[in-house]
Amino acid sequence: MSRRGTAEEKTAKSDPIYRNRLVNMLVNRILKHGKKSLAYQIVYQAVKKIQQKTETNPLSVLRQAICRVTPDIAVKARRVGGSTHQVPIEIGSTQGKALAIRWLLGASRKRPGRNMAFKLSSELVDAAKGSGDAIRKKEETHRMAEANRAFAHFR
């Protein structure tokens, strides 16, 4: 047992311009090699492009995209009796959002396009509409969980 006290729970900070935690989560996931100012630049340019494309509130588009991509259930490999089963497990809201952001960024990196801001804005708009690679990934995950429903008792 640890002799230390209990660790303080860290609260997620919000970004300086929009004061939004989702934007901050997105910035922290897009971050590479410690270049946070570049990550902020990419996200803010993407938000401006979303504003130009949809002519609606870009933060609501971002929220809707993340909400649509967030999975309810996923599969986890579990070794039982010498064989590995894909066991469906429910996902919490924070972990679901983190997965959704990861999938959105992965899908936008694979997209053809000029720069990351353009690709990210396109993927977010598509996800908000209900199409795109990230949505496909979510549906694929849900299909896997449904197919392996028989192993749900292995939790």
Swiss-Prot record:
Which InterPro entries does this one have? Answer: Ribosomal_uS7, Ribosomal_uS7_bac/org-type, Ribosomal_uS7_CS, Ribosomal_uS7_dom, Ribosomal_uS7_dom_sf
**Is Ribosomal protein one of the keywords?**
yes
What are the GO BP annotations of this UniProt entry?
Answer: translation
GO MF, one annotated term: rRNA binding
Residues annotated as transmembrane: none
User: Could you tell me where this protein is found in the cell?
Assistant: Plastid, Chloroplast
Keyword terms of this UniProt record: Chloroplast, Plastid, Ribonucleoprotein, Ribosomal protein, RNA-binding, rRNA-binding
Sorted alphabetically, the Gene Ontology cellular component annotations on this record are: chloroplast; small ribosomal subunit
**Pfam name, any one:** Ribosomal_S7
**Broad class of the protein's primary localization:** plastid
Subunit structure as annotated in this protein's UniProt entry:
Part of the 30S ribosomal subunit.
Entries under NCBIfam families matching the protein: rpsG_bact
Give the function comment from the record. Answer: One of the primary rRNA binding proteins, it binds directly to 16S rRNA where it nucleates assembly of the head domain of the 30S subunit.
Per the record, the similarity remark reads: Belongs to the universal ribosomal protein uS7 family.
| Protein name in the entry | Small ribosomal subunit protein uS7cz/uS7cy
What's the encoding gene here? rps7-A
